[in-house]
Amino acid sequence: SIVPLKHKWKVLLIFSYLFYFINSGKYIVFILFSTLSIYFGGLLLNKIDDGFSMAKKALPKENKKEFKSIIGWQKKCVCVSIVLLNLGILVYLKYSVFFGQVFCDLLSIFHIKISNPMQNMMLPLGISFYTLSAISYIVDVYRGKYKASDNLGKVALFLVFFPHIVEGPIGRFDLLGDQVYEGHPFDYKNATMGLQLVFWGLFKKIVIADRANMYVNQIFNFHDQYDGLYVIIGMLLYTLQLYAEFSGCMDIVRGSAQMFGIEMSENFARPFISKTVSEFWRR
């Protein structure tokens, strides 16, 4: 191996940030901010927990319950602050163009014409996915599912890992964190199986979804020219397109990760055969 096993995570982190910077440029600051917010927020939750563990030994029994509620309130404040901070950035970036245009339209009623100051705002790559992953991390730490990591590189790689930053799936730190950080020796079986999964995903995306999309657009854009049978066919093709699109992207993501020896959760496991709404959501 060219890179020692213990340093492979560093190469993966650099490559992931390079990939992100090429695709998002200056907007990389937002994922850096999210990373730092959950890292230091997690450490603060650890500190509160450790302080409680030490203090409760010296407290009288009658005061422990009150002290525990104070600690719980402090932890909740930290968790809610981090969640709102990350959600606020997501909402601002996703809807600033829309609300900016609404503001301009309202001013035009009073014959005040200005251009939308937010019209050139771009969305950072994968902001929805990494924001939800960041929130899942801080909420899990708050609930005591695991201790927050004191390794900034490990937390950073968990969020920016390049295969899942574009289309998900939304990662869980307890399932993905150690895998991306530990480093894996080259494995021929993983490499070939991962490559096969990538090609299968590309087949679904390019051959099935993109082809179905041509007919769907034709029928939906000119629906007045087609009778009921064609509309039904269009609906069925649209369902097929959605399935092939998302399933194909998930296969590409999982295959890319598998080539690095990393197993990612299947995020689109035949949802259309679900028997209940909750099962559909889980699949």
Placement of each model-derived feature along the sequence:
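Membrane-embedded transmembrane alpha-helical bundles that form the catalytic cores
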Residues: 1-283
